[in-house]
Each structure stands twice: as C-alpha cells, then as structure tokens.
Swiss-Prot record:
Its EC number is 7.1.1.9. It comes from the Eukaryota. The lineage of its organism: Eukaryota, Metazoa, Chordata, Craniata, Vertebrata. Residues 46-59 are mitochondrial matrix. InterPro entries: CcO_II, CcO_II-like_C, CcO_II_C, Copper_CuA, Cupredoxin, Cyt_c_oxidase_su2, Cyt_c_oxidase_su2_TM_dom, Cyt_c_oxidase_su2_TM_sf. Belongs to the cytochrome c oxidase subunit 2 family. This is Cytochrome c oxidase subunit 2. It comes from Vulpes zerda. The gene is MT-CO2.
Length: 227
C-alpha cells in the first residue's frame, strides 16, 4: 500500500506490476536523457557568442532530428506493447471471480462455487478499530489464493466504475452492459488495497477494495466455511 509522502510507485506484488515498474524506469531514463540534452543545448545557446545568420538550411540536422525521435518512440513502444499483450493473456485460470460495481459498493461472486457471493462495503470511520485504515477497510474482504492465476470478470449495475489495485498493477473499467476481464497473481500473502478509480457519484471516494491473498490451504478452509 502507499505511505504518506511516498514519491515512487507501490511495491510490486504481481509479475505484471514488476514489468510495469521496469517499464517506468526504462521510460524515465529516456525522458531524463532527453531533458538533459535539451537543457545542455539551451545553456549553449544562451552562453555562446557565435551566431549563424548566414545559415539558410541544414539538411543533416533535419535528418537527425527526424530519425532520432522515431527511434526513441520505438524504444518506448516495444516494451509497452509487450506488457500490453501480457496483461491481455489469460491461460487456464485456477479461479474466476465476478465483480460488480454499485453506487457505492462492490459485490463479488466466486463462479466456481455454487453459493459463494457477498457485498463489500466500506467501514465507516467511527466504526474503525485501532490500526485499521480510514476509507480503505471493508466489512468483507476478497480472499484469494496466492501464486495462482485468477480471472476477474468486472462489470457494473449502474454507472461507470473502475476496479483498481495499484500494487498488483490492476485497473479495469466496470461498464454497465459490458463484461471486462483481467487476471491477477500475487507472489506473496498479505492485504492489498485499492479503490474505485472512476468518478461515479457523490460517494465515489467510499468504494475501497481489499484483497486478502492467502495460501491455498487457508483459502480452501475459508471457502468451505463461506459456502
């Protein structure tokens, strides 16, 4: 989860988020190099006493500043497309969970079980226990097995919502009448927090998401008690 005054992204918990962090660093380095070059050129222009009033054209320079940006764009686009295809790839998920957005709560249905579904509401501030997080705790957490591929089917009952968990690299729109899907895999156990990331009305800020990633044996025990 995020911490006060945090400058970087949240710690990666899934392979997709790790790839996104690498891509972020890759792109940031390119931006840093370009910015340094531009700043250097501006400094030279402001400090040099040389002028080129007789220069009418520079074909070589124009060629360079046409080809070089194209190469830079390719260097950014190729890893981006690779991650995009990775995010869309769904191979033999071990579990499927259907998520529906409502004003202003989430409902979950484990489609591999006959009667395992529940609603997840935010716990009001006045009901929080010591150590719990304001605006992020829910009455029913989504318990999922770690180190397994899980498919999330996401839609909405009313208006546009967006189901997002930053530490897993997830953000999928919940659109009425449309069923979107995404996959997740957590590499370690723990609680992972998210929120609705699409403005959906007056209580948009009160739609938290809490995933509890646990070992498979614990998940099987929990699901048996819930059914």
């Amino acid at each position: 989860m995020a911490y006060p005054f945090q400058l970087g992204l949240q710690d990666a918990t899934s392979p997709i988020m790790e790839e996104l962090l690498h891509f972020h660093d890759h792109t940031l380095m390119i931006v840093f190099l370009i910015s340094s070059l531009v700043l250097y050129i501006i400094t030279l222009m402001l400090t040099t006493k040389l002028t080129h009033t007789s220069t009418m054209d520079a074909q070589e320079v124009e060629t360079v500043w046409t080809i070089l940006p194209a190469i830079i764009l390719v260097l950014i686009a190729l890893p981006s497309l690779r991650i995009l295809y990775m995010m869309d790839e769904i191979n033999n998920p071990s579990l499927t969970v259907k998520t529906m957005g409502h004003q202003w709560y989430w409902s979950y249905e484990y489609t591999d079980y006959e009667d395992l579904n529940f609603d997840s509401y935010m716990i009001p501030t006045q009901e929080l226990k010591p150590g719990e997080l304001r605006l992020l705790e829910v009455d029913n957490r989504v318990v999922l097995p770690m180190e397994m591929t899980i498919r999330m089917l996401i839609s909405s009952e009313d208006v546009l919502h967006s189901w997002a968990v930053p530490s897993l690299g997830l953000k999928t729109d919940a659109i009425p009448g449309r069923l979107n899907q995404t996959t997740l895999m957590a590499m370690r156990p723990g609680l992972y927090y998210g929120q609705c990331s699409e403005i959906c009305g007056s209580n948009h800020s009160f739609m938290p998401i809490v995933l509890e990633m646990v070992p498979l044996s614990y998940f099987e025990t929990w699901s048996a008690l819930m059914v």
